[in-house]
Amino acid sequence: MGEHIYKGRKLELLIPASSLEVLKIAVIYGADAVYIGGEAFGLRAKAKNFTLEEMKEGIEFAHAHDCKVYVTANILAHNYDLDGARQYFKELKQIGPDALIISDPGMFTIAKEELPDIDIHISTQANNTNYMTYQFWWKQGAKRVVSARELSLNEIKQIREHIPDEMEIETFMHGAMCISYSGRCLLSSFMAGRDANRGACTHPCRWKYSIVEESRPGEYMPVYENERGTYIFLSLIHI
């Protein structure tokens, strides 16, 4: 795979890893970095996730292969989360991840206090849709901001032009297509009683849907999707 350089900095291929086995596979096959979640404070409650011992082993393995490891702590925290988060960050300090991925300002504040020497990346969960937001997080001490999935390539280019060269932009290339906005999805809570903002998303954005017209109960009109958009009645109506 050829290298792509921006102002002397190579673009980074970042891969999610749901287990120690997946982490090692991603590293062996050439990932520049992987991101992982612990048993709390991340948004992948259904994944196996990592114990602290597994994190330590994974970080040591990755570093031995010149690969970075980022740890997610990107829940939208409630009051009862904060003391546990502080203790968790103290434990993470002992195993040395390369960065934390955070969305909540309260969690950000605790992380800066407990891990002042570790980079912080601002999660897509924080709704990062404009260059002023990026500038704000840079002033707070964030190293990288993850673009909202709603952004076009042109919008990302405009952001790049308005932020310091040293600041990093991360962009998703595939995966869930969150709405309302970029991760702060209410569909899972509404439809399945499982809160996406607490790591229990059922991914209703990936389900297949039909439309029912009010006066025709029981008559289901399928919804189609292709690279050009989403359709009902195929060529008749474009959503």
Explain the meaning of each model-derived region:
Residues 145-151, 162-235:
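Flexible C-terminal active-site loop/helix
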Residues 35-54, 73-81:
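Glycine-rich, proline-tolerant flexible connector loops at the mouths of alpha/beta enzymes
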Residues 4, 67-136:
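N-terminal active-site wall of soluble small-molecule enzyme domains
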Residues 6-33:
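N-terminal basic/disordered segments at the start of proteins
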Residues 46-56, 103-115, 150-164:
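Active-site-adjacent beta->alpha loops and helix N-cap segments on the catalytic face
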Residues 26, 104, 137, 171:
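Conserved, mostly hydrophobic/aromatic
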Residues 237-239:
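Conserved small/polar residues in nucleotide/adenosyl-binding loops
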Residues 13-16, 34-36, 69-73, 100-102, ...:
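Hydrophobic faces of well-ordered beta-strands that scaffold small-molecule active sites
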